[in-house]
Amino acid sequence: MARTKFERTKPHVNIGTIGHVDHGKTTLTAAISAVLASKDNTVQLKKFEEIDSAPEERARGITINTSHVEYQTEKRHYAHVDCPGHADYVKNMITGAAQMDGAILVVSAADGPMPQTREHILLAKQVGVPSIVVFLNKADMVDDPELLELVELEVRELLSKYDFPGDTIPFVTGSALLALEACMKNPKIGEGKDKWVDKIFELMKIVDEYIPTPQRDVDKSFLMAVEDVFSITGRGTVATGRIERGRVKVGETIEIVGLKNTKTTTVTGLEMFQKTLDEGIAGDNVGVLLRGVQKTDIERGMVLAKPGSITPHTKFEAEVYVLTKEEGGRHTPFFPGYRPQFYVRTTDVTGTIEDFTADDGSKAEMVMPGDRIKMCVNLIYPVAIEQGMRFAIREGGRTVGAGVVTKILE
């Protein structure tokens, strides 16, 4: 079968369902896909079973089960991620395996917010999911409208507690299962025939309006992690790597950041696949020729960046998932003072883990394999780090944890 071309006509947004186990995240994912397919024949229907049996993926040495569904509204194209198990959510959000521009928090109206509801909201805040909309599910099981109001109030309070705008976040109340069943009975149902189906249309209109279109990588400030360095006789030093974001032109001034003192230089040439380029953009694997830079001035682990856009740091706070023994992680706990390697972009840097903090703010004495914990890290030399950056924790070449920087300390 010939592959269909991806038409880039609408803005693209990455979105995901989050919330407590059995509150209906996967059912809602299936319902959105079915409801949009009932109106627009270009949306491919994904059944509940297909979404629920999520394939394994590997991100930063960790196996994660995630399901990807794509669909579109009149305004946008969406890639939607759903995870079958709670541990998969934690790993997915921390490794950034599936980056989310926004999330739909699913809360069962019959049960109200539960422990994982809280944990997913906290995680969304820590890893920088910018906006959340709420779907109160299983509304067909609640007869008392006052109870629905009470649940909504509880969820709003919880969102505010974790610094989301709880008072203004949009809520939609419905039943994912009944919407899905209506679509199964009549796959071309469209809008205006069933109140539960219409609730899903309402939800997607809100997602369209409320979750902002993300800034494209190309429009951000230039950054490239250096993977390799070599010198060309008579021409100078070339740094190679993949441009993470932004764009770079020949003749521009850039900074070399990390490991040593920041150095300013000019791009005198760009190459890709042995051909010269005038400009490299996000996603390109390029060689960058640098003026007046010796091969000894630059090494793997440094980054090339737009001047002033990123600075080197040694101390930061991070949210970390520690791998279990079964996932190839440690067999034993570790304690404050533990010194593993932190794999940042392209290189390992040794660092000391100074302390651990649990979700409730208390200090933890030790960390077990399988835990998720907030930690304070001190690296032995400065690296270009920023909030929201992902890294792996390694010990003797094997990955023992994955983390995301939540706060720069120094």
Swiss-Prot record:
Family: Belongs to the TRAFAC class translation factor GTPase superfamily. Classic translation factor GTPase family. EF-Tu/EF-1A subfamily.
Domain spans labelled tr-type G: 10-215
Gene that this polypeptide is encoded by: tufA
GO molecular function: GTP binding; GTPase activity; mRNA binding; translation elongation factor activity
UniProt organism field: Cyanidioschyzon merolae (strain NIES-3377 / 10D)
Segments of this protein annotated with the region G3: 82-85
EC number: 3.6.5.3
One protein family per Pfam: GTP_EFTU
Cellular compartments annotated: Plastid, Chloroplast
Binding residue positions for Mg(2+): T26
Top-level EC class as recorded in UniProt: hydrolase
GO CC term (a single one): cytosol
Segments of this protein annotated with the region G5: 175-177
Identification of the protein by name: Elongation factor Tu, chloroplastic
Location of the region described as G4 in the Swiss-Prot/TrEMBL record: 137-140
Keywords: Chloroplast, Elongation factor, GTP-binding, Hydrolase, Magnesium, Metal-binding, Nucleotide-binding, Plastid, Protein biosynthesis
Function text: GTP hydrolase that promotes the GTP-dependent binding of aminoacyl-tRNA to the A-site of ribosomes during protein biosynthesis.
Region feature (G1): 19-26
Catalytic activity: GTP + H2O = GDP + phosphate + H(+)
GO biological process terms on file: chloroplast organization
